[in-house]
Amino acid sequence: MSASNRPAVRYAWHLLPLGMAVASPLLAAEPISLEAVNVNGFSEQDSTSDYRAGRASVGGFEQASLLDTPASVSVFTEALIKDRQAKLLSDVLRNDASVGDGYAPVGYYENFVVRGFSLNAANSYRINGRSIAGEQNVALENKQQVELLKGLSGLQSGVSEPGGVINYQTKRAQDVRSVTVSTNEHGERYFATDVGGWFGSEQQFGLRVNLAHEDIRSYVQHADGQRDFASLAFDWNISERALLQLDVEYQNKEQRSVPGYQLLGGTTLPHDASPRKLLGYQNWSSPVGMESLNMNGRFEYQFNDSWKGSLSASRSRVVID
């Protein structure tokens, strides 16, 4: 150590007791008690009470936790569907940025694009895991949730498009009495009822009935219409191990279809085109009629705590006129 630094060292040693004396009252002070922080969580069984869902059946052969599913799955719960007042699938899927409209004109059935790939009307749409005809606007009044599997889905649906699969889960028997009446700024009138319950000597039979009528008032001129819907879900707990479930739903809709604009080689959008005008409208033309019937049944037997077997069948029919 050089001679020039020795006075500074001695000065530092003299200040050390003073620093310890100043710090000693702080060390002797009472510890500070912080307020407790409460962290509340919920189980997967309770997660369907809001917009979050913890389980889905579209990712495999049975319902499974989303955390344990090695796939990208979006689940839209009953609460979300109800709060959005969704009546079409497009009202639900707009919450997912990976989904776009493939061809979804007013008054016709919708088709969608997932991650840039169009869904196939033959096998990309399902109810309770069973394939349905995709050329229909499936009603949402009797749906518990809508599940979207994004990506390859050959394991779930065989030959399918790489975009994914959309699965509707129907409501099951529950003690419920509900009536919904609504309207909007266009003068649309909507009425729906939801009734269900259990009955029998051992409460082994369950029913869920949904009815709806809608007077459609479109923002497009001359594109009004109407829709009627009815569904029935039946549950039979044959024994502690055996369960039978049956579902049937019918819908009839009439509305003029609104064709889109095509540029046909042009590079600029037309300035006088109005989205409220129905192209090619004739007062003698008839609206597009779509009549759909979807039925499915499932028998399930629990062999033991680890093994379960099921047998299911379905039928879907759509008539477009």
Residue ranges: model-predicted function:
Residues E214-S218, S231-N237, R241-Q302, S306-D321:
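Acidic/polar loop-and-plug regions of large Gram-negative outer-membrane beta-barrel proteins
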Residues E44-D46, S98, L119, I132, ...:
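Structural signature of outer-membrane beta-barrel domains
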Residues T48-R52, V220-Q221, S257-G260:
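Short acidic, glycine/serine/threonine-rich loops at helix termini
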Residues V73, V106, N184-G187, H222-Q226, ...:
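Short sequence motifs at beta-strands and strand-loop junctions characteristic
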Residues E141-Q144, L155-L232, W236-L244:
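Outer-membrane beta-barrel translocator/receptor signature
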Residues E35-V176:
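Acidic, small-polar-rich N-terminal luminal/periplasmic segments of exported/outer-membrane proteins
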Residues M1-S33:
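Cleavable N-terminal targeting peptides that direct proteins into the secretory/outer-membrane pathway or into
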Residues S2-A3, E30-P31, D91, Y103, ...:
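Outer-membrane beta-barrel proteins
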